[in-house]
Each structure stands twice: as C-alpha cells, then as structure tokens.
C-alpha cells in the first residue's frame, strides 16, 4: 500500500512577502498522519491554525489566500505546489506573518528546503481524490475542468497578447507519468507587467516584487537580465500555480486538468463544484504496484 508522507525533519528559511514586502520566517515541520497541510500563524496571540483546504480559500484576486476565524495566510500556492510535486501529505508550516515568502518566484527554493530535510513515509495508507465524472467551470472565455484519467496530467493554455510571450509557447501539457515536477515545472517563475506592478504598489501591494523574484515585462520585452528558465516559462508557471491550487483539495488528484486562461479564482471554483457533488469523485488508496505511474517512487522519490 502506498503510504502517507511528511518531511523528515524541520527546516527553516526567511523571505519577503510579495505583496506585503515584509520579512517572514517560515518553519516546515513534520505532522501526524491524516492531519493534512496546516499553517500556524505564530505571530497571533492564539497561535492560530489555518488548514490548507479548498473551502478555507477567502480571496483569489492576486494569490490564493486561506483563512480561519479571520486569521489569514496568503500566497500559499507555490509552497503547496512544491508539496504536491514531492508527494507530501502532512505538514505543519509555521510562519510569523500573513504571507508565505515569495522566494525566487517559483517553487525551487521550497523544493530545495524540503529535499535537504528529507521525506519520511508514515504508517498509514495514502489517500487520493480519484475523478469519476468530468467537472467544469467557465467564466466568459475562461475554463477549468477535471476529468477521469488514471494518472495526473495538466493541459494549460494562456492567451497573453505580448511580443515576448508570443515568442514562447502559450500551451503546455505535462503528464507526470512521463515528466518530473522538479525539472519540468518547479523552477518556473511568476510574471507580471511593469504597469500593473506600479498600479499595485499605489494600492499598497506588490511591495516585495522585484526582478529577483518575478519575470517583469514592459510593453515590448522582458526586463530581467536573466534568460528564461524554460522557453515557455510563462505557461509552465501557470501550471505550477494550478498544481498548488488543486492541492487544496487535501489529497493528490488522479485525473486530468484542462484549463484555458484559468487562474486562482476559477481553480477554486472548480474544487468547490467537485466537492458539492460526491458522485464526481471518490477517495481511494492504492497498492504500490497498482498506483498511477505519476505517483510512483520513481516520480516522487524519498529523500533521506
């Protein structure tokens, strides 16, 4: 039977919040079986615990924000994406501020931290959300869909009318039975447009944004001196975000995700629609030799 997994030892780092611009210390700790991923705001009087669940999402305008009893944790998607990519089920994540640090704008720093601490199997069967019937949400020309598939595959299309983006691929498909999260998705950075960044700063947001943690574009070109990490890094980052958003379902998904111009709001609406209809999914466990290849030890190895 495939087993649940957690981090083998605590690991700590410090970074800057993308929107707050404030320094945040984060500690990722092992957690018991069946506890899921939980954030702990150690800067609050009651050391408030905020579970990372789809129904806890309270804001999706600029990032995925979760809350419980008025205590918020924002910009959780990159860290959760790394957790999904490494196959972690249970974690306690302490932070002394509201916002998960942006690091370099990708999941790479979180991957490195977790791998340096190691991953430990736990004595409980790993549970999966197996998609049984297609579920779809639309908003204008935007689409997000989950459908049955014995594995985990994502097909994402973006549509940015910009010369620099047009030169790269605007669609990417990744099947994790054939490709590794770490190499194909994990290093893709967030991106934004210079005029939008200035507007956000006037609103008191994006205070921590810089060329060190995002790809920034003006009207014609990329402003960063560093080359793109992937030739189609823009759409790959949207997949990185989607993996983090989908992990708020609480378990790895066995199914295919298709998106056109989707974002945090539509991804969360998709999960809520799925949860509203129990006939669309089931919770299952797998023997190691019967599990989808996307979740095999080859694709999600242990690091001791």
UniProtKB/Swiss-Prot annotation:
Any one GO cellular component localisation term in the record: membrane
Residues holding Zn(2+): 78, 237, 241
Cofactor annotation: Zn(2+)
Listed pathway(s): Glycolipid biosynthesis; lipid IV(A) biosynthesis; lipid IV(A) from (3R)-3-hydroxytetradecanoyl-[acyl-carrier-protein] and UDP-N-acetyl-alpha-D-glucosamine: step 2/6
GO BP, one annotated term: lipid A biosynthetic process
Record: active site: 264 (proton donor)
Keywords: Hydrolase, Lipid A biosynthesis, Lipid biosynthesis, Lipid metabolism, Metal-binding, Zinc
Chemical reaction(s) catalysed: a UDP-3-O-[(3R)-3-hydroxyacyl]-N-acetyl-alpha-D-glucosamine + H2O = a UDP-3-O-[(3R)-3-hydroxyacyl]-alpha-D-glucosamine + acetate
Keyword Hydrolase: yes
Pfam name, any one: LpxC
GO MF assignments: metal ion binding; UDP-3-O-acyl-N-acetylglucosamine deacetylase activity
Domain of life of the organism encoding this protein: Bacteria
SUPFAM superfamilies: Ribosomal protein S5 domain 2-like (SSF54211)
Its biological purpose: Catalyzes the hydrolysis of UDP-3-O-myristoyl-N-acetylglucosamine to form UDP-3-O-myristoylglucosamine and acetate, the committed step in lipid A biosynthesis.
Name the record gives this protein: UDP-3-O-acyl-N-acetylglucosamine deacetylase
Organism from which the protein derives: Polynucleobacter asymbioticus (strain DSM 18221 / CIP 109841 / QLW-P1DMWA-1)
């Amino acid at each position: 039977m495939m087993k649940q997994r957690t981090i083998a030892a605590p690991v700590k780092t410090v970074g800057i919040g993308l929107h707050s611009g404030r320094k945040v210390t984060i500690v990722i700790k092992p957690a018991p079986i069946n506890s899921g991923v939980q954030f702990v705001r150690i800067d609050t009087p009651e050391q408030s615990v905020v579970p990372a669940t789809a129904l806890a999402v309270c804001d999706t305008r600029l990032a995925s924000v979760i809350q419980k009893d008025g205590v918020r944790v924002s910009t959780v998607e990159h860290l959760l994406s790394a957790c999904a990519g490494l196959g972690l089920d249970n974690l306690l994540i302490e932070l002394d501020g509201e916002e998960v640090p942006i690091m370099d704008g990708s999941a790479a720093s979180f991957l490195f931290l977790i791998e340096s601490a190691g991953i430990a199997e736990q004595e409980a069967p790993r549970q999966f959300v197996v998609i049984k019937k297609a579920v779809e949400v639309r908003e204008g020309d935007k689409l997000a869909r989950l459908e049955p598939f014995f594995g985990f595959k994502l097909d994402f299309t973006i549509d940015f009318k910009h010369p620099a983006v047009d030169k790269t691929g605007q669609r990417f498909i990744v099947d994790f039975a054939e490709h590794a999260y770490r190499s194909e998705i994990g290093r893709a950075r967030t991106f934004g447009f210079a005029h939008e960044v200035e507007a956000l700063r006037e609103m008191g947001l994006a205070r921590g944004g810089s060329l060190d943690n995002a790809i920034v574009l003006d009207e014609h070109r990329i402003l960063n001196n560093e080359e793109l990490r992937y030739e189609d890094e823009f759409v790959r980052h949207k997949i990185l975000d989607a993996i983090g958003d989908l992990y708020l379902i609480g378990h790895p998904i066995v199914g295919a995700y298709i998106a056109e111009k989707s974002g945090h709001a539509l991804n969360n609406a998709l999960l809520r629609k799925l949860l509203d209809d129990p006939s669309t999914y089931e919770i299952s466990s797998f023997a190691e030799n019967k599990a989808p290849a996307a979740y095999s030890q080859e694709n999600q190895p242990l690091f001791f």
